UniProtKB/Swiss-Prot annotation:
Subunit annotation: Interacts with the cannabinoid receptor CNR1 (via C-terminus). Does not interact with cannabinoid receptor CNR2.
Species: Bos taurus (Bovine)
Protein name: CB1 cannabinoid receptor-interacting protein 1
GO MF, one annotated term: type 1 cannabinoid receptor binding
UniProt family annotation: Belongs to the CNRIP family.
PANTHER family the record matches: CB1 CANNABINOID RECEPTOR-INTERACTING PROTEIN 1
GO CC terms, sorted: plasma membrane
Role this protein plays: Suppresses cannabinoid receptor CNR1-mediated tonic inhibition of voltage-gated calcium channels.
UniProt xrefs under InterPro entries: CNRIP1
Length: 164
């Protein structure tokens, strides 16, 4: 096992397919478990792009609400600062969220040698008939995380989460 990095920076981007369209979130205040709700459309595919620093880290998949998304190594960024993985998250068969409710979904990414990244997203899934609701709110390009691996190499503590 290699040295344990002091900090891990990772970003997760979601883009609705086939047109690489933006994903939106809305600020709900304290009405629900979290103050931000990510809006997703059922029966759709989303391109997932994960960028990681340091570039020595390896990951094979991300689990989004129990759906395992295999990640493929795409590249290192031109400046060599971060490594980039991509995959496709499919919401086919996901039930729409009931009106006035939100769904907490667990996000996990097991890293080789340093432990698992875990967080929760608050999501509302809309069906095709309410697809316009998916575009109300603020678009985001990426969710950035600053994490610290723990000494047992089992989990990473999330120090900071930012919607950009």
């Amino acid at each position: 096992m290699g040295d344990l990095p002091g900090l891990v920076r990772l970003s997760i981007a979601l883009r609705i397919q086939p047109n690489d369209g933006p994903v939106f979130y809305k600020v709900d205040g304290q009405r629900f478990g979290q103050n931000r709700t990510i809006k997703l459309l059922t029966g759709s595919s989303y391109k997932v792009e994960v960028k990681i620093k340091p570039t020595t880290l390896q990951v094979e998949n991300i689990s989004i609400g129990g759906v395992v998304v295999p990640l493929e190594l795409k590249s290192k960024e031109p400046d060599g600062d971060r490594i980039v993985y991509t995959g496709t998250y499919d919401t086919e068969g996901v039930a729409p969220t009931k009106s006035g409710e939100r769904q907490p979904i667990q996000i996990t990414m097991p890293f080789t040698d340093i432990g698992t990244f875990e967080t929760m997203w608050q999501v509302k899934f809309y069906n095709y008939h309410k697809r316009d609701h998916c575009q109300w709110g603020s678009p985001f390009s990426v969710i950035e995380y600053e994490c610290k691996p723990n000494e047992t190499r089992s989990l990473m503590w999330v120090n900071k989460e930012s919607f950009l």
